[in-house]
């Protein structure tokens, strides 16, 4: 397979849905005996991710022989267009020297029939030494070409099919593709004709199509079986907004705050850990968490040894969250917000809070997402007259009680850059989305201001006047509808704050931190 790359794009598309209608008459496979666990994998190549995700699916076949007595696996995957597969998988492989032109030509012929096709299958553990061709079986093709897997009915239908085909005591749902974190301008009502979402990004046509927090929750909640674990193998998804939105539909969340390598999580480790720790799910998930981040560090070290200069910026992480304790954290965080809002009326307090906001740890260069723990901790320490030591300790403990495990790459740990979870910050209800240059992140190409009332101003570097438009919704119709905001009233601070937060991420600016 071609060497792993970082991907966290934000473009998508519209297709025909993969539902139980005329376009998808396929019946479930003959159900197997009930297992302890069933892994339900749901993904899309996202133009640039086919190589990595195909390897992930191959890894499902590499578990220990005995593991499959305890763990069953069902999968649905949509391939990118053959043009994207050629450009981002085959041509890049030739350019990087990881495959020959002859091999690329051979793979092109093999993969061309999978152009924008969706496959659905159950992993057969009797297949030894599985290779790419096991995923190119035309019998696996499901539904019409170019179907929309970002449709809520498609995901619900897949879960219902998979849980019938692979009955188990416990279910783990994996959603794999590009991720965009939480952004209000993506969080439009999923009932609307032009649906837009922030997970499972498609890249073929316009208008854009992908899951939002609300549409993903809706799809999962309508399924016949409850998911014990939801794992989003996608960038930027470990934010408090998504955690609260999904807390009532699953017991555990596996999410990453920063970017996720194209290689994805260690799926073989997931299969084996679930089998070896069948009676202790938290142990299994924690071990999987550790194995995945260690794999990413190992990949980065190998790439650095091969001369890849960017490999030293190996900023990856994974967190397993225990959702049953989020309500208790939300109660404490509401008190934090109540006092923050009241304290801001005092000029001395305001100056201290503004200084903290100005230097808040930004997770991603583009998005308005910041380290929730670092931000809250800095404020409680700076304002002992507002937050006594006992409250600060209670707030921290309530958050820690939600953590099953958390691992960060060596680069993040060695430079003290780890982040527990992100949260959105805004200025008087308006938030900023930046466009930093991909090749040189110190160059700002422009930025957008999304106003609470739906107005949008787009500023392009070098131009004097902004382009004024709308973003098709408002903060009251998006952020204020989130479970997190209803529990904590965080939007009160988004409206009240007058200080622009830090504009770039110390992790993504590629400055020589600590060197």
Where are these regions (language model features)?
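Active-site-proximal beta-strand/loop segments in catalytic clefts of secreted hydrolases
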Residues: 41-46, 76-80, 175-179, 232-236, ...
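Bacterial Sec-dependent N-terminal signal peptides
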Residues: 11-35
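Bacterial N-terminal signal peptides
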Residues: 3-13
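Loop/turn elements at helix/coil->beta-strand transitions in domains of secreted/extracellular proteins
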Residues: 35-38, 67-73, 166-172, 224-229, ...
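Extracytoplasmic/secreted cell-surface and envelope-processing proteins
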Residues: 48-53, 82-86, 181-185, 237-242, ...
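Catalytic-core segments of thiol-dependent peptidases
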Residues: 81, 92-93, 98-135, 139, ...
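N-terminal carbohydrate-binding/catalytic regions of secreted carbohydrate-active enzymes
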Residues: 49-82, 89, 93
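Terminal, contiguous helix-loop blocks that mediate binding/assembly
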Residues: 160, 164, 188-515
